[in-house]
Amino acid sequence: MKLTCMVIVAVLFLTAWTFVTAITSNGLENLFPNAHHEMKNPEASKLNKRCVPYEGPCNWLTQNCCDATCVVFWCL
């Protein structure tokens, strides 16, 4: 009896899961959109970008300081 109830609950859960994922037009495609984009274009990954340490020379246009703000071409 308990096994039958567990099977019924599992079937209902899987059916509901199927309907919930079918409602969205993309299904499960958009779960990890950024990671997929970074796999196609490794240049876009934030892990590949280098940053300038504190009190180092920086580029104020790209703001490439690690944990500081670029002020007059120095990370402060």
From Swiss-Prot:
Molecular function via GO: calcium channel regulator activity; ion channel inhibitor activity; toxin activity
Tissue expression summary: Expressed by the venom duct.
Claim: Signal is one of the keywords in the record: yes
Disulfide pairings: 51-66, 58-70, 65-75
Propeptide: 23-50
Pfam families: Conotoxin (PF02950)
Family: Belongs to the conotoxin O1 superfamily.
Protein name, UniProt field: Omega-conotoxin-like TxO5
Native source organism of the sequence: Conus textile
